Amino acid sequence: MNGTEGENFYVPMSNKTGVVRNPFEYPQYYLADHWMFAVLAAYMFFLIITGFPVNFLTLFVTIQNKKLRQPLNYILLNLAVANLFMVFGGFTTTLITSMNGYFVFGSTGCNLEGFFATLGGEISLWSLVVLAIERYVVVCKPMSNFRFGSQHAIAGVSLTWVMAMACAAPPLVGWSRYIPEGLQCSCGIDYYTPKPEINNVSFVIYMFVVHFSIPLTIIFFCYGRLVCTVKAAAAQQQESETTQRAEREVTRMVVIMVIGFLICWLPYASVALYIFNNQGSEFGPVFMTIPSFFAKSSALYNPLIYILMNKQFRNCMITTLCCGKNPFEEEESTSASASKTEASSVSSSQVSPA
């Protein structure tokens, strides 16, 4: 084996030289230069000072504006809550460990950090699945006269938490485990060892199938059908001007949604799958560190994509930040009517399928 396995860790370096140390007790500067740990700490600090305000503002603005308390926005708020879980439960911990060069909070802290990071990421992922299904049902109309109400939104939010817990909780109770990964400053699922006594292989397979492949398939299917439906409606010149605008807006949103998801999670999932399929092979600590830390940026991407691109949310945010006045209101007044019609077309199922 080209790594060193301990009771609750796996360091991707052979201990033939005798330099490998427990990542819960000793700095890991033998894995990489000091400046790399400093870069990780700076990156986590950036995610905290940007991710927290944007996600907190999403919650605050929704509470302040009654018109935003719509069923669909329950899911968007769930995304913000999930991202805050990642910020407080994962990012702050990783910032401190990166500054110290090792996981100073011990095995228990590793379990908590891994749990909250996984929970937040999975809530975000399944929230996107619920959004995709809602968009598909409302716009493509596979069921006639369906209206997405509060009960559907609450059920969707509940589903995200159930599925997230089904992924994040098992390693805490003996099915797989959380261990430090990469430069040993953040924790994740053990992809590195078979560990038969905790049935690690079966859990990793379960996680990749149920909590990655299936959600990704659903998202691609729903948004693929949505784009086709909007294009067909536009081609038939149904409500031509607003539908054409809706087509452009929805297409742009879908492209950014898919790209954002893939940019955040596909590199991490691909590297994790490679490591899992090649356990014991030689790879450096940076090999997993970069995609692992890059996946954490989803806490910043999500609100920018799903909240800030929503005109109603954006206007309410500007009004809140500017103490009740929107300085851009006059500039947008000429398109306000069209925007409302567009929102109705896309969000209230007025865009008819072919």
From Swiss-Prot:
Residues 333-354 are annotated as: Disordered. It is a multi-pass membrane protein. GO terms for cellular component: membrane; photoreceptor disc membrane; plasma membrane. The record marks E113 as: Plays an important role in the conformation switch to the active conformation. Residues 1-36, 97-110, 174-202, 275-286 are extracellular. Phosphorylated on some or all of the serine and threonine residues present in the C-terminal region. It is found in: Membrane; Cell projection, Cilium, Photoreceptor outer segment. The keyword Ion transport does not apply. Keywords: Cell projection, Chromophore, Disulfide bond, G-protein coupled receptor, Glycoprotein, Lipoprotein, Membrane, Palmitate, Phosphoprotein, Photoreceptor protein, Receptor, Retinal protein, Sensory transduction, Transducer, Transmembrane, Transmembrane helix, Vision. GO terms for molecular function: 11-cis retinal binding; G protein-coupled photoreceptor activity. Pfam families: 7tm_1 (PF00001), Rhodopsin_N (PF10413). A lipid is attached at C322, C323 (S-palmitoyl cysteine). Residues 62-73, 134-152, 225-252, 309-354 are cytoplasmic. The modification N6-(retinylidene)lysine is found at K296. PROSITE patterns: G_PROTEIN_RECEP_F1_1, G_PROTEIN_RECEP_F1_2, OPSIN. Its main location: membrane. This is Rhodopsin. The gene is rho.
